[in-house]
Amino acid sequence: MEHYDWNEGWLFTPRFDPALVRPECGLELEPVRIPHTVRVLPYNYCNENEYQCLCGYRREFFAPREWAGRTVLLTFGAVAHDATVFCNGRRLFHHACGYTAFTVDLTSALHLGQKNVVAVRCDSREDLNIPPFGGQIDHLTYGGIYRAVSLDIKEPAYLRDVFIETKAEGDFRIYTSTVGETVGCTLQAEIRSPSGSRAAYSGELSLPITGVLNGVHPWSIEHPTLYTLTVQLIRPGSAGLPDRVLDEKTIRFGFRTVQFVAGGLYLNGQRVELRGLNRHQSYAYQGYAMPDSIQRLDAQILKKDLGCNAVRTSHSPQSPAFLDACDELGLLVFTEMPGWRYIGDESWKAQALQNCREMVCQCRNHPSIFLWGARVNGSADDEAFYKRTNEAIHRLDPTRPTAGARNHRKSQLLEDVYAYNDYSYRGRGAACEARAAVTSDPRKGYLISEFGGQQLPTKPFDDETHRLVQALRYAAGINDSIAQQGVAGSFGWCMADYNTHREFGSGDRICYHGVMDMFRNPKLSAAVYASQKTPRSPSDIVLEVSSGMALGDLPGGVPTACWVFTNAESVRLYRGNDYIAEFTPDRHGRFAAMTHPPIEINDFVGSLLEKYEGMDQASAQMAAAILNEMRRDAMELSPLSKARMLSLRLSWNEVARMYYKYIGVLGTPCAAYRFEAVWHGRTVRTVVREPVQSVRLECTVHNPILTDGPTWDCAAVSLRAIDQNGSLLPYCGEAVQLSVDGPLKIIGPSVVPLRGGMAGTYLATTGEAGRAVLHCRMEGALDTDAVVTIRCRDA
């Protein structure tokens, strides 16, 4: 058994020519590294026609004579979207799904002891009669060999697949499938715990290996314990010869039980309230073509930064590296068959059914996956078709339920869970529809598969009010899905902004639906999710203030709502050095069902009137109520406040004077406000809002140590313009000039504008080890540098 990474040495042409597959090729070809995208696109105003092409890849290699009598298998992690593989001019394999892996047996076409050629005809055109194509699609589909490639040299008989079914109590059942002549062969399995203890089992090929492992630690969201299974295919020795290991497969898995009932989701017998986001697997410039480290980073952002416990992989199976990270972090995954609204003819459906089978077979050992999507997202009912998809999935994996995201009520429910894209909220009333009014079978599970961002696209540079409205809508969706009995939870739409087709988005080919921008910089809405984390240390405390406290940014210069998104116990507010008030979450208000409801800051006067106006406590409280009402209602006063003015013997001029002094209007001196997050009785985080005195450019490299190999690696970089207190400057739109010293290259442009005070870039390795420095320069701010260390795996 030999394994080789095959991500180097590829040549690419954007226009396929039959000469590409021949042993000798005189075409002009571009050297590329895998993962590869057929076309690097601009951040916005891109053209989806540019990546739609019939292109080709070619790789030459030497096949040693020692491979005689062996099986040579070439595996592609994903090729978007229709791939035909040739070896030495001979057509060997065709694969018509851009989101699943496939393996090609090269053995019969090889010339041993000679140079050989593998070529791939890659069709990324969107007129293909395969999923997800056929209708309009609200995301780009890109093209190319965008996941890793590998070559395996095996015996003629080998293991094709290993699948382990488990229960939380330790029961397991191991299934295998083989290729080649295996008469007389046996199986040997070993399960290794995280502590290193081992348990061995043996079995025959015709039956699954079953057993019970005592004292297991179940895989859960809080404790994602992973075990390792190694299965060997053994040919018994004869005539005194020892047994021979023909093949070996190692997988990671977890012991856990998933159950959906009318009351919700139960993991290992414990109810779980799903709080998740939808994730597209696309990135700025590169589309789908990003290495494992970037895929894993998204899982870390979802779990650690955003506080999610679940993710929906909209709208296709996603990177194995992403799923590995979800396994490790305890992030539940709802993955689904490729497609968007459209259902095609019988040929299209046959391919969709094959996609379902490949999705399940390739992903079913991941304990993080708790739900299979057996419908095309948002599609109409099709009883015959969806009976087949559900049957295929349950036959290959009886341990997990199925669902299917639909856009309409009372849809035919062939799955185990009714998943509903709920875009009913318009800012008033309930943020999600009544479960009973939607599901066609109240005895089954129910979840909200999408809500939120599509209803109010929000750019990072939108005004303060717009950004706040989006955040509060996300909060309402989370809250109401929790509050409604029988709803298993919700998946907000969506994690990050994404490029889309001309029929969608904001006219610049971007859907600004995310709680983050395309570079994974957080918008205000991200704090809604992040603040739901349970803090275990001061570093876990979130404190995000919705307002910049700049009157000139608000309509009419009249201050309006100010909200704080936090998981602290309380928030203290100061004006200058004067304490105003302490605020706690309203456990009976609009967001009472949330673990950590957002806090409305509705008192900007507090005890100031006692200190500076000589009022007694009762009078000060009445007067403060008048001033805060004026702030809330644009200087209007209710009859109650007018009565209070009479009671306090306050004239309108006197009330106006105090309003100008303690709250302010356009032209009055700007106050400095300090917000303090209190946790366990002490201040652990502070936000200051005051006029900007200096501008800094902050550069964060999220993965500063890179490893070149088995593919190129990549550093994700976030850029933010901040003031002297570290607060984001959302209207800073300066250009940032980027340059690199050392073995890295910038993906995309070397000059990037700040959007909403934020930007980003990606730095790709080049095959060399060393130290690289990213230089960031912005007019009006000091230069900023960041250091990245690059290692080569072979080194």
Question: Language-model segments: what does each one mean?
Answer:
Residues 111-115, 180-259:
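Extended acidic/polar, glycine-enriched regions
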Residues 174-177, 231-233, 562-566, 713-730, ...:
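Beta-strand-rich structural segments
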Residues 559, 692-724, 730:
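Beta-strand-rich domain onsets/edges
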Residues 3-16, 37, 48, 52-159, ...:
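Accessory beta-strand-rich segments of carbohydrate-active enzymes
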Residues 185-188, 222-226, 559, 567, ...:
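Short flexible loop/turn segments that cap and initiate beta-strands
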Residues 173-175, 300-302, 310-527, 532, ...:
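Substrate-binding/catalytic cleft of secreted carbohydrate-active enzymes
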Residues 38-63, 67-76, 80-87, 93-96, ...:
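Active-site-adjacent substrate/metal-binding segments within catalytic domains
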